[in-house]
Amino acid sequence: MEPPTVPSERSLSLSLPGPREGQATLKPPPQHLWRQPRTPIRIQQRGYSDSAERAERERQPHRPIERADAMDTSDRPGLRTTRMSWPSSFHGTGTGSGGAGGGSSRRFEAENGPTPSPGRSPLDSQASPGLVLHAGAATSQRRESFLYRSDSDYDMSPKTMSRNSSVTSEAHAEDLIVTPFAQVLASLRSVRSNFSLLTNVPVPSNKRSPLGGPTPVCKATLSEETCQQLARETLEELDWCLEQLETMQTYRSVSEMASHKFKRMLNRELTHLSEMSRSGNQVSEYISTTFLDKQNEVEIPSPTMKEREKQQAPRPRPSQPPPPPVPHLQPMSQITGLKKLMHSNSLNNSNIPRFGVKTDQEELLAQELENLNKWGLNIFCVSDYAGGRSLTCIMYMIFQERDLLKKFRIPVDTMVTYMLTLEDHYHADVAYHNSLHAADVLQSTHVLLATPALDAVFTDLEILAALFAAAIHDVDHPGVSNQFLINTNSELALMYNDESVLENHHLAVGFKLLQEDNCDIFQNLSKRQRQSLRKMVIDMVLATDMSKHMTLLADLKTMVETKKVTSSGVLLLDNYSDRIQVLRNMVHCADLSNPTKPLELYRQWTDRIMAEFFQQGDRERERGMEISPMCDKHTASVEKSQVGFIDYIVHPLWETWADLVHPDAQEILDTLEDNRDWYYSAIRQSPSPPPEEESRGPGHPPLPDKFQFELTLEEEEEEEISMAQIPCTAQEALTAQGLSGVEEALDATIAWEASPAQESLEVMAQEASLEAELEAVYLTQQAQSTGSAPVAPDEFSSREEFVVAVSHSSPSALALQSPLLPAWRTLSVSEHAPGLPGLPSTAAEVEAQREHQAAKRACSACAGTFGEDTSALPAPGGGGSGGDPT
């Protein structure tokens, strides 16, 4: 498939339509972030069970989401943090009230649409028995994701108003609307309200009328000038709606409008990030290639040394024809990865263990499983106590907890046999995508299904499908990405036409295993139930393809915001499309839940995913392929990748889910913010990767150009806006205080308050700029002291030539530069907990190896010139590597 063509500016930016012929040029689409009165929204309960009768015990709602650690959260930073706009103080400090100004303070925003005019009656927050979004204005508040960042936020001038200034008082609480379709609905409702006011036509009481609010203003009470202004604003708002509706015809769905907008916003954010530093460029490329649905060009791997030798071997003589090719015994249609296992012979309904698996640590396992219904269950301990059978144990206990074995007449021995067979088809030698990850996603899905806002919403069959999908969603995962399989022309990629390769394979294996002996757990379902369950499972597992992330996010956010601007405020979920949309996003949230778990668990998952990435990078290096982003163990920045992953992927998703089930997911967001802050604080302490030119070594393919994103004309203009100046540069600090003040100067610049995503940009910029400034200052000062001319790095083709030239012109300069900069530049995080056995720890093994390599290179460069004592260099595990920075 050919890569998609670059969309035009009009198709990318729905809110930038050009004027029609013969029409006066309209103002740019209104420059504000949409704010609507907070509307009570609830999800319609649809019946909990497929059976007609339910026991009274089952009618009780599930317990709300609880934290497994059950710790006191009164002192947690996330709960004390007030809700900050994204970005916050970085973009101005203007004050004001977005709701008090009426039409006089009208602003315009190129992304979003017109401000609701003063004639519109706000909706009052009313109590609702179901799901209420932002019901209380005085609740704990936090930062918002980049989705709420407007085009005007890129303006660094002091005139730019902070979005904090537009938050209204408690009496006029508002929600922010960012999806295009919800904005059009809100705008049309505003036009309708203004029309009624201007014409004195009474508004009939129907679903389009506000549920509550102040008494409508009478036209007689308005001055002529006010009426004229209101009429002009109403006409302008209607014109904007027409422009948006004219562009809708090119889209398959209204949610795709939001998807295109979000992708464009993310591309713009990643473009800024990629320009900051090498590590920022790598993080940007990783996020773009993993979470944006793009068709990348297939890379043909260069032949290895053995293949070259085969090509150079003498061809057989004509008298000796080559042997005929061996035919493939395995047809393309055959599902690969299946094993012949025998678990059914030793199992029957009478000898099933208490927790579904045999263990000699039953009491310890029972203690851990007390947290089965809580967020943050320590799945690592469960696996240890269950003899490595965490997936079977968790699935068995959840089915018992929800009484699904009885409801669907699933034989217990069949259930356990299938789960043991399924778990055996997860690869134990894969660091992350193994049965432990599947068990974690399964338990997380179970907890999300039990959230009070979703009580009595989904049927038992839908719950069964969601749990089954979570259990099989990564079965037979080989530990490499879809793109790796495509680039290597694997059989799986050929079979599934490069589309969601692994996800299709997981489904095929999961359903194929049902055909094994005594493994069909759905044998007593009706034909219609089986067909319905299979369709739902396929939809949910395919949604775990991370390249579909932005589409899933846009679908969910459009659904939530559309209900925010409607007066009914009821999410009916009365059709398959809406119901499966919520279930798809639920499993997707569970699949991306690692950063929302307690920090000690999150760090273990990070160690595992990075180990898997590095293993893939090693395989790509062996094949002579370009190493995928974040897969090069010599250059990957673990902490920065996690901050970017949270800012651009995890936070927007969980923020939207929290809106859907408010307030049930608030503590999850608090944990996510705390974990993000921890990894952000670790950036300045972890060793920076060595120069990429040196780390790759000879014989490796050249580095690709800086990762670039397609920008529209509007976005290119924004790129010209200069970044805010850092208060104190490294050179000023060196001049004023000498080398002893360098570290304080760095602390001062990093301590500069900024928003989450902007913080990651600034740290990466500081890393590159400070390193360059310090190197220049060192060389200049030492060259002046020896009377030689300073050496310019760009006069040489490589860093090695530059170092040699400096050593000849000023040995003392190199003596200072080589050992000091790597040691001073960054310090690693203290290891409060050891890394996993056999896996690199984020700040211990991986970072110590980097520092050790940097020290060896510095030593080898110095040894032949001035005999520097190598004992002065920082050693791995010391103050400059994996040790405590204090």
Swiss-Prot record:
Gly residues biased stretches: 93-104, 876-886
Entry note: cofactor: Binds 2 divalent metal cations per subunit. Site 1 may preferentially bind zinc ions. Binds 2 divalent metal cations per subunit. Site 2 has a preference for magnesium and/or manganese ions.
Binding-site residues, Mg(2+): D474
Residue spans of biased composition, Low complexity class: 36-46
Gene3D superfamilies: 3'5'-cyclic nucleotide phosphodiesterase, catalytic domain
Biased composition (Basic and acidic residues): 51-78
Binding sites annotated in the UniProt record for Zn(2+) 2: D474
Catalysed reactions, as listed in the record: 3',5'-cyclic AMP + H2O = AMP + H(+)
One Gene Ontology term, aspect cellular component: extrinsic component of membrane
Requisite cofactors: Zn(2+); Mg(2+); Mn(2+)
Entry keyword set: cAMP, Cell membrane, Cell projection, Cytoplasm, Hydrolase, Isopeptide bond, Manganese, Membrane, Metal-binding, Phosphoprotein, Ubl conjugation, Zinc
Region Disordered, residue ranges: 1-128, 294-331, 682-705, 866-886
Pathway info: Purine metabolism; 3',5'-cyclic AMP degradation; AMP from 3',5'-cyclic AMP: step 1/1
Active site: H433 (proton donor)
Composition bias, Pro residues: 315-328
InterPro entries: HD/PDEase_dom (IPR003607), PDE4_UCR (IPR040844), PDEase (IPR023088), PDEase_catalytic_dom (IPR002073), PDEase_catalytic_dom_sf (IPR036971), PDEase_CS (IPR023174)
Occurrences of domain PDEase (ranges): 357-686
GO-annotated biological processes: cAMP catabolic process; cAMP-mediated signaling; cellular response to xenobiotic stimulus; G protein-coupled receptor signaling pathway; regulation of adenylate cyclase-activating G protein-coupled receptor signaling pathway; regulation of cAMP/PKA signal transduction; sensory perception of smell; signal transduction
Phosphoserine PTM sites in chain numbering: S13, S152, S157, S165, S209, S346, S686, S688
Annotated residues for binding of Zn(2+) 1: H437, H473, D474, D591
Residues spanning the membrane: none
Binding-site list for Mn(2+): D474
Cross-link (Glycyl lysine isopeptide (Lys-Gly) (interchain with G-Cter in SUMO)): K358
EC number: 3.1.4.53
Family, as annotated: Belongs to the cyclic nucleotide phosphodiesterase family. PDE4 subfamily.
Protein name listed in UniProt: 3',5'-cyclic-AMP phosphodiesterase 4A
Source species of the chain: Homo sapiens
